[in-house]
């Protein structure tokens, strides 16, 4: 039998202000939180990158701030949906080589796609001051007892996206979160 708290969680990440990561209530399941009467596992946040540290080729620690607060983020690029296995990359490369040998009319498109895939493969390059959208899970750093985000998607955005994001959050909070009858 499935735990009712798991079956009732949001299917999509809950879009939140950073301050609400710390306001969310824990549940019996350490991976599930509840806020505004809504149980959830994943969150989506947006803000300005204020610190980047402990960076390797595939992992990094970040600090993201919005108008409401700051949160620490751990990001492992191999855990995202954009990762491609070495076997898949080898197969793509071999197919590309074959297509170029035989004069495939779509070779320029394939070349562009290969470049884009290669540039995205397990690459961690973030700069302080850039705007970012982050999707991940809340977890508690056991050494400090502080809530953090374990991110599986980090995308650099823009100031224009930040404005749209803040408007969208205002709408969600006014229409769905704050006035949620299950609160």
Predicted regions and their residues:
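OB-fold and OB-like single-stranded nucleic-acid-recognition modules
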Residues: 1-183
């Amino acid at each position: 039998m499935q735990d009712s708290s798991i079956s009732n969680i949001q299917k999509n990440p809950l879009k939140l202000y950073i301050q609400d990561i710390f306001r969310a209530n824990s549940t019996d399941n350490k991976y599930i939180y509840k806020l505004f009467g809504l149980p959830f596992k994943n969150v989506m946040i947006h803000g300005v990158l204020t610190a980047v540290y402990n960076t390797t080729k595939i992992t990094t620690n970040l600090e993201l701030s919005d108008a409401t607060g700051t949160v620490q983020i751990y990001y492992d690029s191999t855990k995202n949906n954009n990762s491609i296995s070495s076997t898949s990359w080898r197969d793509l490369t071999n197919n590309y080589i074959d297509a170029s040998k035989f004069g495939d009319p779509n070779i320029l498109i394939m070349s562009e796609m290969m470049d884009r895939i290669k540039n995205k493969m397990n690459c961690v390059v973030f700069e302080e001051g850039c705007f970012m959208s982050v999707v991940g899970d809340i977890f508690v750093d056991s050494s400090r007892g502080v809530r953090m985000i374990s991110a599986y998607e980090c995308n650099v955005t823009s100031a224009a996206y930040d404005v749209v994001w803040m408007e969208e959050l205002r709408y969600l909070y006014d229409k769905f979160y704050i006035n949620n009858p299950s609160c």
